[in-house]
Amino acid sequence: MAIVSSARESLSHAMNNRFLPNLEYLLQGSILDSAVEHLMHRLKGLCDNVDTSPEPFHDLEVCMSLRQPNANQPLLLRVRRALGRDAPFQMRYLGNPEVDLRRPTLVRSCMDCACTNGILEFLTEMGFRLEFEYIAKGYMFRKGRMKITVSKLIKIVPGKQQDMANEPISQSYIVELSVVAPTGQENVGEEMRVFAEQLKPLVQLEKIDYKRLGGMP
């Protein structure tokens, strides 16, 4: 019981002092398939652990929505699971993006947690419905607290096994530069801007206003 109380006190202290990483700072871009190897080479030179290969990933991502009577937009939750390896499911809540002209990055509230493999059934029983799903396959790099992913998005073909889905959504890779940090660390955006400058002209990382585009990421 003492351990539980201590954990609760630590969590309460972290929340009261804004230590919890609850904001995602994000820049996004894309690069053609024909140029992605050049970007990978650049990232290997810029990022940590240059002597080792970047971390590969091959994940299924599912977006679930719950309609709320007094809200203009549904509640969206993302559930991601690794394909081909044993790992916990990951559930993520993303708030509406805030695009401030004074900030170099897009900012949105973010909460992540690990889940058991019954999370999709649980959400369905709560009233959530499937919005969309896709497979993301690529590589992840680290530079300090920054995370850089280079992903190929793959369409899930009805009637085929997930490992047989082989229809890319586009002839390009999605490139994302992100940091999840506590509230009040505005210097994060400047760090990301400086790093993004080093990837030009291979890829132009920008803050994308999804409200203007009429959709969510």
UniProtKB/Swiss-Prot annotation:
Keywords: Activator, Nucleus, Transcription, Transcription regulation. Its main location: nucleus. GO terms for molecular function: transcription coregulator activity. Disulfide bonds: none annotated. Pfam families: Med18. It is found in: Nucleus. GO terms for cellular component: core mediator complex; mediator complex; nucleus. One of its GO terms (biological process) is positive regulation of transcription initiation by RNA polymerase II. Component of the Mediator complex, which includes at least CDK8, MED4, MED6, MED11, MED14, MED17, MED18, MED20, MED21, MED22, MED27, MED28, MED30 and MED31. Component of the Mediator complex, a coactivator involved in the regulated transcription of nearly all RNA polymerase II-dependent genes. Mediator functions as a bridge to convey information from gene-specific regulatory proteins to the basal RNA polymerase II transcription machinery. Mediator is recruited to promoters by direct interactions with regulatory proteins and serves as a scaffold for the assembly of a functional preinitiation complex with RNA polymerase II and the general transcription factors. Belongs to the Mediator complex subunit 18 family. PANTHER family: MEDIATOR OF RNA POLYMERASE II TRANSCRIPTION SUBUNIT 18, MEDIATOR OF RNA POLYMERASE II TRANSCRIPTION, SUBUNIT 18. This is Mediator of RNA polymerase II transcription subunit 18. The gene is MED18.
